């Protein structure tokens, strides 16, 4: 009887070891199996038309495969019971075939001819479709302001800009005046709110409206870094101190297409930043244990 129990114990122990060794990662206690891992490696090699790899390339391939499977598992868990339809999968595959100038239906046949399990490929297609749905949801919360558009165009130095600014020039160069100019700077908020009593005892104010390219080079550098209603530091010039306060910046001769291009660029940048944070947070909150030998 003891011998029989020993045999049973050994049998179950071996089974548990075999089952554990078949798991290469856990994602929130959802297993990724060795078969899934091998299928993903084979799929990546087939899609990249790779026949053989060096040990270093094999390590890199393993890292890519396990990462894609972990990301995939997290996305499936996030999506829950919601389904990706067969029509969506078919359309995604057709889109890949079109981009690669392949006849419809030939991609899965190609993978099968390379002994690749098509389920691994379809699983990745599903995860990419989920990712697209996530990005679509994030994009609805993204807005681009006119100020952001102007800043982006101005920073490119590709368009002529008309600038209106107020220049405060000290009446002398004493230490007392320098302190007064710094105090003035701290009080300058909006151009329209500047009162003469703020500066008349120690400085004068000049209003200039002109194309940025027509302004003296030193001031161009200062003005480029300032948004409307922003003020420069107090700087020294000849026998006086100056402060520049930008009131308005108007971009000249910008077409609708150019404006739309900037809007799309800024929108995509914001979506990308939101997506990166979304996926980073997803990883941080997850329990991930990789048991694949390094």
UniProtKB/Swiss-Prot annotation:
Task: Report the superkingdom from the record.
Answer: Bacteria
InterPro entries, alphabetized: OMP_Chaperone_SurA, Trigger_fact/SurA_dom_sf
The signal sequence is 1-18
Q: What is this protein called?
A: Uncharacterized protein RBE_0210
> ATP-binding: is it a keyword of this entry?
no
Entry keyword set: Signal
């Amino acid at each position: 009887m003891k011998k029989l129990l020993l045999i049973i114990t050994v049998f179950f122990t071996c089974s548990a070891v075999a089952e554990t060794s078949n798991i290469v990662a856990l994602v929130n206690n959802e297993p990724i199996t060795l078969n899934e891992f091998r299928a993903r490696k084979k799929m990546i090699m087939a899609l990249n038309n790779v026949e053989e790899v060096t040990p270093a390339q094999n390590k890199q391939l393993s890292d890519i495969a396990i990462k894609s499977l972990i990301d995939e598992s997290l996305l499936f868990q996030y999506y829950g019971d919601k389904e990706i339809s067969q029509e969506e999968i078919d359309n995604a595959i057709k889109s890949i075939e079109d981009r690669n100038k392949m006849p419809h239906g030939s991609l899965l046949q190609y993978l099968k001819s390379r002994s690749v399990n098509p389920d691994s490929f379809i699983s990745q297609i599903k995860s990419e479709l989920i990712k697209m749905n996530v990005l679509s949801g994030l994009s609805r919360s993204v807005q681009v302001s006119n100020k952001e558009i102007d800043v982006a165009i101005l920073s490119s130095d590709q368009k002529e800009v008309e600038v209106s600014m107020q220049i405060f020039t000290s009446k002398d160069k004493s230490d007392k005046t320098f302190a007064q100019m710094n105090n003035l700077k701290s009080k300058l908020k909006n151009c329209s709110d500047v009162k003469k009593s703020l500066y008349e005892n120690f400085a004068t104010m000049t209003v200039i409206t002109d194309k940025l390219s027509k302004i003296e080079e030193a001031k161009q550098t200062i003005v480029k870094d300032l948004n409307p209603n922003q003020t420069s530091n107090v700087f020294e010039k000849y026998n006086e101190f100056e402060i520049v306060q930008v009131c308005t910046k108007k971009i000249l001769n910008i077409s609708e297409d150019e404006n739309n291009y900037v809007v799309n660029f800024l929108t995509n940048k914001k979506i990308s930043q939101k997506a990166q944070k979304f996926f980073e947070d997803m990883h941080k909150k997850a329990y991930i244990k990789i048991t694949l030998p390094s």
